[in-house]
A protein has these predicted regions:
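Glycine-rich beta-alpha loop elements in corrinoid/cobalamin-binding modules
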Residues: 1-91
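Radical SAM [4Fe-4S] cluster-binding motif and immediate context
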Residues: 93-94, 98-198
Length: 198
């Protein structure tokens, strides 16, 4: 419901901008959301990293031939047109770490406090990042199953992925399946990198 109320304001402020929907709802119901939100130009279906990179190239070169970009649902006069489906990213470890230095972090920090834990609630410089995609279950009614995730050493270990966190006091690693044994290289690694808050 929120996108329907925000979309007219966004379009009013940026009348010439390319306005793209995305996320879970858009992925499962692309034509419905384009009907519901007439201000949207198109919908990105599924993972957006590679799709948006190609969209930037199209816009940057002035071509705007979006039918050549995989993973989109486009408006086609009164109908809709799907481009070739986008394949899932085979290795999430290749996805760059968030570039915190490019974000206006103070805007996000205003909403840092959420009641997930005492530590998070008291934080004033906090961001959330999601480190896995999909679901480990195989429900027959689901349109998609299967998991892809970032190696835990790249989440909790030292190195480039930790460097950006100096700008943020807490970065929550949102992970719905951290308890699965296959997630952890060793039991010691799990003990050294998990702190449970009661």
């Amino acid at each position: 419901g929120r996108i329907k109320s925000l979309a007219p304001l966004i379009r009013k402020c940026a009348p010439d901008a390319l306005f793209i929907g995305g996320g879970g709802w858009s992925t499962y119901n692309p034509t419905e959301i384009l009907q519901l939100v007439p201000q949207l130009d198109m919908v990105c279906i599924g993972e957006g990293e590679e799709t948006f990179s190609e969209l930037y190239d199209q816009v940057g070169t002035g071509k705007r031939d979006f039918e050549k970009v995989n993973g989109l649902c486009l408006r086609d006069k009164e109908n809709f047109k799907f481009t070739t489906p986008r394949a899932l990213i085979s290795d999430l470890n290749t996805v760059p770490y968030p570039s915190y230095e490019l974000l206006e972090l103070d805007i996000y920090f205003r909403y840092s406090s959420i009641p997930y834990s005492v530590e998070a609630y008291n934080a004033r410089r906090r961001l959330s990042t999601v480190w896995e995609r999909g679901c480990p279950r195989g429900c027959t009614f689901c349109s998609h199953n299967g998991m892809s995730r970032i190696d835990l050493q790249n989440i909790y270990g030292d190195g480039d992925r930790k460097a950006g966190e100096k700008l943020v006091r807490i970065t929550d690693k949102e992970n719905d399946t951290f308890q699965l044994p296959a997630r952890w290289p060793t039991a010691e690694y799990a003990v050294n990198n998990i702190k449970l808050l009661y």
